């Protein structure tokens, strides 16, 4: 058996994300047959002992027809109105579809602000855990009716990756309207499906343009980012067409499989690495980089060469060097204090200097060396 087949067959929890393009008909209305099909397949997998969460787009698309709109509006207020109109209809359809298989669903609407704040993040995690314990299928969506343009996920691919990390999922399934990740846009001659992606693979040269839709917000670039985020969090990812969900849940080799990293970080480390907003940035030297990446040590002020931005002690900051982002962590100093201490080795500052700027327990290293 392949690693993918083993991962899916042995999965305790799976997050399935289905986008607007896969949930809507050509005329823009909800594809009720698709919802019924997903509910049937998920219910069958649930009966075999797997807990499944669904991240469902489609609220805005469901609200277009009642509001007399033919395509997704551009202004935020109209998007919010369509989401408010469509979310209730969307949930009613999911509820009806799962009731046919004797399962209940629960609506969970999240905003980017919810997951960025640690307390809100842990509360959402606890609520999802409890719903799964009750045998309920959570249906999760971004709360488009109250989000702001500045603070929002922007697409449900990232939301699905956050949810997968939040609940400790074993597998994340990203369903879309193409077969998987290809070497070029699928419409181009010679484009080939990439069947497997490993954490160390370099994908920067792949052209992922042109895979969006008129009713959704997420293209292939956002799916690739979400897949990478989950993959580096120890979660296997399958990216494929919504038409292949039956084969996906059976562990068959369809779409693109993102092999997870071997060691799964703790939930708090994942939150620091991928979710918490950055309050500032510090630049470190080569010795400090070796200490935190290879030596698994805390970051000391002596290894810091510059402090950028204004932040307080207890906030998450980016740790960079000349090559780019190395790690993220919770600073034990405010920016002014850190700027005064960085690089100092004088005897009179030795005691303060030896206190970590970022303790290793508060550090999420993002590079592999």
Each language-model region and where it sits:
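C-terminal catalytic "cap/lid" subdomain
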Residues: 2-72, 76-104, 108-369
């Amino acid at each position: 058996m392949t690693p993918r087949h083993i991962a899916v067959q042995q999965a305790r929890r799976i997050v399935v994300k289905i986008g607007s393009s896969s949930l809507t008909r050509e005329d823009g209305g909800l594809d009720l047959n698709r919802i019924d099909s997903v509910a049937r397949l998920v219910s069958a997998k649930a009966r075999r002992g797997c807990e499944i969460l669904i991240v469902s787009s489609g609220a805005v698309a469901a609200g277009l027809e009642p509001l007399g709109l033919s395509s997704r509006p551009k202004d935020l207020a109209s998007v919010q109105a369509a989401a408010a109109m469509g979310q209730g209809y969307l949930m009613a359809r999911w509820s009806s579809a799962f009731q046919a298989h004797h399962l209940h669903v629960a609506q969970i609407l999240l905003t980017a602000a919810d997951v960025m704040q640690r307390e809100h993040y842990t509360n959402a995690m606890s609520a999802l855990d409890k719903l799964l314990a009750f045998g309920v299928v959570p249906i999760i969506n971004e709360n488009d009716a109250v989000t702001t343009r500045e603070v929002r996920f922007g697409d449900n691919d990232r939301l699905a990756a956050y949810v997968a990390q939040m609940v400790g999922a074993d597998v994340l399934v990203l369903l879309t309207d193409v077969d998987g990740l290809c070497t070029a846009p699928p419409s181009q001659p010679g484009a080939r499906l990439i069947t497997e992606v490993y954490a160390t693979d370099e994908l920067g040269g792949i052209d992922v343009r042109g895979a969006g839709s008129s009713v959704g917000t997420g293209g292939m670039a956002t799916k690739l980012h979400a897949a990478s985020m989950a993959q580096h969090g120890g979660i296997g990812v399958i990216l494929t067409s919504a038409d292949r969900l039956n084969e996906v849940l059976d562990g068959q080799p369809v779409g693109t499989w993102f092999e997870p990293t071997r060691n799964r970080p703790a939930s708090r480390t994942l939150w620091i690495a991928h979710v918490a907003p950055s309050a500032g940035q510090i630049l470190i030297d080569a010795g400090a980089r070796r200490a935190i990446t290879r030596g698994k040590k805390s970051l000391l002020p002596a290894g810091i060469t510059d402090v950028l931005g204004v932040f307080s002690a207890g906030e998450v900051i980016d740790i960079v060097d000349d090559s780019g982002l190395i790690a993220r962590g919770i600073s034990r100093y405010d920016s002014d204090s850190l700027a005064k201490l960085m690089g100092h080795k004088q005897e009179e500052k030795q005691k303060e200097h030896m206190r970590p700027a970022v303790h290793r327990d508060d550090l999420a290293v993002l590079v592999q060396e």
